[in-house]
A protein has these predicted regions:
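Conserved small/polar residues in nucleotide/adenosyl-binding loops
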Residues: 128-129
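N-terminal/domain-start alpha-helical segments
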Residues: 1-123
Length: 129
């Protein structure tokens, strides 16, 4: 079972994401603030991260940068920030995907599945070489 960390300060959104992901058999942990989320992300192993950008404490850009400096795990940013500059910055810091709010929870699950499948293939290939 793949483990996913959601770092999202809006509890209703985090719970919606969690519910849809758990229905698809993912194990989900939620952190509702940036500092706790960053510590959780760096101290524990997850198969994928879902980050909000506008968080109390440490923002999603900083969390993305910190995760990417240590891990190659897939990162999906989900934010109300719709400007191209925010998307470009997030992707430039190492996010693998960027979704804007409001979003379709089913689409989020589909993107999670796609990123995890690709990441698992890359890991498998790296072990065979």
């Amino acid at each position: 079972m793949s483990k996913i960390l959601i770092i999202e300060d809006e509890e209703s959104i985090a719970e919606l994401e969690r519910d849809y992901l758990e229905i698809s058999s993912y194990e989900v942990t939620i952190c509702n603030d940036g500092e706790k989320g960053l510590k959780e992300a760096l101290d524990n192993e997850y198969d994928l991260y879902i980050l909000d950008l506008m968080l109390p404490g440490v923002d999603g850009f900083e969390i993305c940068k910190a995760i990417r400096n240590k891990k190659n795990t897939p990162i999906i940013m989900v934010s109300a920030k719709k400007d191209d500059i925010d998307k470009i910055r997030g992707l430039g810091l190492g996010a693998d995907d960027y979704m804007t709010k409001p979003f379709s929870p089913s689409e989020l699950v589909a993107r999670v599945k796609a990123h995890l499948a690709r990441y698992e293939r890359l890991v498998a290939v790296s072990y065979t070489h």
